[in-house]
Amino acid sequence: MAQHTAAAAGGDEEVAEAEAAAAAAAGSTLRHRHAGKGAEEHEAAGGGGGGRNGGADDPDATSVERVFADKAVPSWREQLTLRAFVVSALLAVMFSVIVMKLNLTTGIIPSLNVSAGLLGFFFVRLWTSAVERIGLLKQPFTRQENTVIQTCVVSAYGIAFSGGFGSYLFGMSETIAKQATEAKDAQNIKDPHLGWMIGFLFLVSFIGLFALVPLRKIMIVDYKLTYPSGTATAYLINGFHTPEGAKLAKKQVKTLGKYFLFSFFWGFFQWFYTAGDDCGFKNFPTLGLEAYNNRFFFDFSPTYVGVGMICPYIVNVSVLLGGILSWGVMWPLIAKKKGSWYPADISDNSLHGLQAYRVFISIALILGDGLYNFLKVLIRTIAGFISMVQNNSKGMLPVSDNGMSMSTAEEVSFDDERRTEIFLKDQIPKSVAYGGYVVVAALSIGTLPEIFPQLKWYYILVAYIVAPVLAFCNAYGSGLTDWSLASTYGKLAIFVFGAWAGLSHGGVLVGLAACGVMMSIVSTASDLMQDFKTGYLTLASPRSMFISQVIGTGMGCVIAPCVFWLFYKAFSNIGTSGTEYPAPYAIVYRNMAILGVDGFNSLPENCLTLCYIFFAAAIAINLIRDLAPHKVSRFIPLPMAMAIPFYIGSYFAIDMFLGSVILFVWEKLNKAKADAFGPAVASGLICGDGIWTLPQSILALAKVKPPICMKFLSRAANAKVDSFLAG
């Protein structure tokens, strides 16, 4: 912690530079670090359009495009450069490794847009500087090319998440099936293999790109949907390409590199002490052995300290509260009912025992939270359409950047006029969109049953008929709130298609595969609209954005399965509860699929009652959050975040809370530097520890074992060991 607080206590000159650069980047460059999927939607939506429309008395002072007025906008072909895609591929591998590690440990994926943007800017600047010195630079680095890189990288590493390697895809495996209550037959199991995973992702990941392309003008120009994450990314990129922003970006990259090296070498140092099970700093009983047995300890993970610095305070506090409620109160109390509520002769890790309460109560919280937010966004979407119908008759557009109606007769700003002109210049033919959707759908309908024989062609046909409607709802809702409900639509598919198939016809596998189909379409369509918003605000061509998204998706369909395969082969205990890589959402998704086809027959006593209580509590807490004044609601925890430690424990919650404390203290000491450099520090901690996983995996594959086991024993256990060794 001393390192972080010391970094915050820099000189006044650096603070002034940071403040000036932040102001030059339209005030919102780094303020939106929380505006990612799964982040606090109210914070994201509230700041999404800020900084751009203020100061109406002096348009030149607040106009972003007047700053770049003397720079020609490159054609869409010039925006697609070889160096952009080389850098994108390198960063895609890096971030796919990081996301995969997060997937397989806790399933919490923070927004990595800031680090992706910083590193993309840095590497191409490095490239162009080197080429310029030898006099071979033909094309300068523009913000449009920067946007292409950002789009390509995010779409590539996004496959590591939406591909289901920590959820539905891995949930099909025998490893996870053995830990479930039933459906362990061959009909409901499919183990991972590199070939079919790559094929599956190519079949399902592209169709979402075609679903909403014809509606881009309506969503971005006519409705003026905010898309806070896309807006924040655009401000970040615009800021980099001003003189002040470039200067700040260099300092941020230097800071990121410093903490990257610290985190990487800390991971390397820890490796030497992990020669056996439960060895090393990751198993340090910092709060005592009894707390350690209940999964309360600090595991010295730079990754989750960094995640805690990126996630909103309320998320981190919610996760910690969930850990205290479950592992500190509920599970010890339920454990005392052993022999009464569930058989005394089975392990606590059996889904016929205590583990059932851990898994199914967390599922109840997740489903309650998901259902509430699904209905909330659906209501807002319907309300938006009603507003559109009413206002169209009055010559009004339904939504402006501040969420208010805007007259078509209202004076259009220089920025909006310039952006709309460029955005409508390079059209994507509707024949490409419609034809692409039909062709990819036909290929999927014909080929997916070869990968999953249980997944009949008519299941896929129904999914592809319904998917564009759901994709539009999700993209519209995401534009309003920054809240993507792709995983909720995926869970809905689990129940609908799993129940349709039935347990005896591989319903569990059908539900999980259908979840992947639906999630991929809905998530990709929403992400594409976010990227179109970024392109709109940086004058990047929609055509170059679409091509970049296609190339990035193709990269991800190869890179993500290869990275997962590396983990799967290098670490033998992936997916096992209580290990370094428990893949918690894999067991959660599989048990959802079992519930969808078989109901609640196998749950232990009172488990279903507790599930009902927590399902209702999740809805009630969300309702109170929305009805209460902001000064009260910002202290009410998030049920979805509380559910995460119910199954895997609180060790990562302590890491994340420590990250929050570090950032909070830093902001109190020096808010300007914390705002400017906090995301860079966090990204360095996450990236360094994540990238260390690559050499660690290679060492494991080469059968190179660490030399030392550092383990902690109680006094009594130590005495027994000493006695045994003494003979």
Curated annotation (Swiss-Prot):
It is found in: Membrane. The keyword Transmembrane applies. Residues 45-54 have a biased composition (Gly residues). Expressed in leaves and at low levels in roots. It holds the Pfam family OPT. NCBIfam families: OPT_sfam. May be involved in the transport of nicotianamine-chelated metals. This is Probable metal-nicotianamine transporter YSL14. The lineage of its organism: Eukaryota, Viridiplantae, Streptophyta, Embryophyta, Tracheophyta. The gene is YSL14.
